[in-house]
């Protein structure tokens, strides 16, 4: 084995020289230079400074402006709530541990940090699944003139939390476990060992199939169907240009969210899958640290995409920031998310 396994950790460093110590008790400076740990801390500080204000503002602006409280926006707000969970439950913890060079909060703190990081990532993934299904049902109309209403949105939000908890909670109950990963300053699912005592192998397979592969298949199917439908409707000019433009812009926004999610999380999932399927292989701590910390940036991009691509929300946010007066105010057109639940784009 090219790593060192302990009762509740796995350090990607051979202990032939006797230098490996528990990541819960000693600095891990044999894995990387102190300045590299400082860089991780600085990165986490940046995510906190950017992630908290932008996600909190997303929630606050929606509460302040009644016209933003639409069914589709419930799902988007769900992403902001999940991101705030990651900021408070994960990023602040990792910032502190990176400054110390090891996971100072012990196994219990590792469970908390790993749980919030996994929960936030899974809520984001399943929210994108719900958004993809909503776009498919509204635009492609497989169920005739289905209207995506408030009750559907609430059920969608509840569904994302149930599925996210079905992934994040089992390691706390003894099916798999959370352990420090990479440079041992943040925690995640144990992809490094089979650990038969906690049936780790079966959980990792379950997680990759149910909580990654299936959601990706659903998302790609929905958007594949949606692209064909929008092209057909545009070619046949079956609906007004205004309606088609509104649907296209909302769909474009959600697709960009999916692409951003893939950019952030696929490297982490790929590395985790490689480590799991190549037990005992030789890899350094940076190999898992970089994709893990890159995935954490997901807490920033969703609200940024939403603000940049939604004129109505952007105007409301500027109005809130500027104390009731928007210096860049424009006449609000029909291209707003608040209108999309009444889509009239015809199916192919």
From Swiss-Prot:
Organism in which the protein naturally occurs: Trichechus manatus
Keywords, comma-separated and alphabetical: Acetylation, Cell projection, Chromophore, Disulfide bond, G-protein coupled receptor, Glycoprotein, Lipoprotein, Membrane, Metal-binding, Palmitate, Phosphoprotein, Photoreceptor protein, Receptor, Retinal protein, Sensory transduction, Transducer, Transmembrane, Transmembrane helix, Vision, Zinc
BP-aspect Gene Ontology terms: absorption of visible light; G protein-coupled opsin signaling pathway; visual perception
Positions marked as site (Plays an important role in the conformation switch to the active conformation): 113
Chain positions carrying an annotated carbohydrate: 2, 15
Membrane topology note: Multi-pass membrane protein
GO molecular function, one term: G protein-coupled photoreceptor activity
Major place of residence: membrane
Membrane-spanning ranges: 37-61, 74-96, 111-133, 153-173, 203-224, 253-274, 287-308
Membrane-side (Extracellular) residue stretches: 1-36, 97-110, 174-202, 275-286
Sites of Phosphothreonine modification: 335-336, 340, 342
Modified residues (Phosphoserine): 338, 343
Protein name as annotated: Rhodopsin
A cellular component annotation (GO) from this entry: membrane
GN (gene name): RHO
Residues reported in the UniProt entry to bind Zn(2+): 201, 279
Quaternary structure annotation from Swiss-Prot or TrEMBL: Homodimer. May form a complex composed of RHO, GRK1 and RCVRN in a Ca(2+)-dependent manner; RCVRN prevents the interaction between GRK1 and RHO. Interacts with GRK1. Interacts (phosphorylated form) with SAG. Interacts with GNAT1. Interacts with GNAT3. SAG and G-proteins compete for a common binding site. Interacts with PRCD; the interaction promotes PRCD stability. Forms a complex with ASAP1 and ARF4. Forms a complex with ASAP1, RAB11A, Rabin8/RAB3IP, ARF4 and RAB11FIP3; the complex regulates Golgi-to-cilia rhodopsin/RHO transport in photoreceptors.
Residue numbers spanned by region Interaction with SAG: 330-348
Residue numbers carrying N6-(retinylidene)lysine: 296
Functional summary from the UniProt entry: Photoreceptor required for image-forming vision at low light intensity. Required for photoreceptor cell viability after birth. Light-induced isomerization of 11-cis to all-trans retinal triggers a conformational change that activates signaling via G-proteins. Subsequent receptor phosphorylation mediates displacement of the bound G-protein alpha subunit by the arrestin SAG and terminates signaling.
Family (UniProt): Belongs to the G-protein coupled receptor 1 family. Opsin subfamily.
Residues lipid-modified (S-palmitoyl cysteine): 322-323
Localization per record: Membrane; Cell projection, Cilium, Photoreceptor outer segment
Disulfide bonds: 110-187
SUPFAM superfamilies: Family A G protein-coupled receptor-like
Post-translational modification: Phosphorylated on some or all of the serine and threonine residues present in the C-terminal region. Contains one covalently linked retinal chromophore. Upon light absorption, the covalently bound 11-cis-retinal is converted to all-trans-retinal. After hydrolysis of the Schiff base and release of the covalently bound all-trans-retinal, active rhodopsin is regenerated by binding of a fresh molecule of 11-cis-retinal.
PANTHER family for this protein: OPSIN
Modification N-acetylmethionine occurs at: 1
């Amino acid at each position: 084995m090219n790593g060192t396994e302990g009762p509740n950790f796995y350090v990607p460093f051979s202990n032939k020289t006797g230098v490996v110590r528990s990541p819960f008790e000693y600095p891990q400076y044999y894995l990387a230079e102190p300045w590299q740990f400082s860089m991780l801390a600085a990165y986490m500080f940046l995510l906190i400074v950017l992630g908290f204000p932008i996600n909190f503002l997303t929630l606050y602006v929606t509460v302040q402006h009644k016209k933003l409280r639409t069914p589709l926006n419930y799902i988007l707000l769900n992403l902001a709530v999940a991101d705030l969970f990651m900021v408070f439950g994960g990023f602040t913890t990792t910032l502190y541990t990176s400054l110390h060079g090891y996971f100072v909060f012990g196994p219990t703190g590792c469970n908390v940090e790993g749980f919030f990081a996994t929960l936030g990532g899974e809520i984001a993934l399943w929210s994108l699944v719900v958004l993809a299904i909503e776009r498919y049902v509204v635009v492609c109309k497989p169920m005739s003139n289905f209207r995506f209403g408030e009750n559907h949105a609430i059920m969608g939000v509840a569904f994302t939390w149930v599925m996210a908890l079905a992934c994040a909670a089992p390691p706390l109950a003894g099916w798999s476990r959370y352990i420090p990963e990479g440079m041992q300053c943040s925690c995640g699912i144990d992809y490094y060992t089979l650990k038969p005592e906690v049936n780790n192998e079966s959980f990792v397979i379950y997680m990759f199939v149910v909580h990654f592969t299936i959601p990706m298949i659903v998302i790609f199917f929905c958007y594949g169907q949606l692209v064909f439908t929008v092209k057909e409707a545009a070619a046949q000019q079956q609906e007004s240009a205004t309606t088609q433009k509104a649907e296209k812009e909302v769909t474009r926004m959600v697709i960009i969210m999916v692409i951003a999610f893939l950019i952030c999380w696929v490297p982490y999932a790929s590395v985790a899958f490689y480590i799991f399927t190549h037990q005992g292989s030789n890899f350094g701590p940076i190999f898992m640290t970089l994709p893990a910390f890159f995935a954490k940036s997901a807490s920033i991009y969703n609200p940024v995409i939403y603000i940049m691509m939604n004129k109505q929300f952007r105007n409301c946010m500027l109005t809130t920031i500027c104390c009731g007066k928007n210096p860049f105010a424009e006449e609000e057109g029909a291209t707003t998310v608040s209108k999309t639940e009444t889509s009239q784009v015809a199916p192919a």
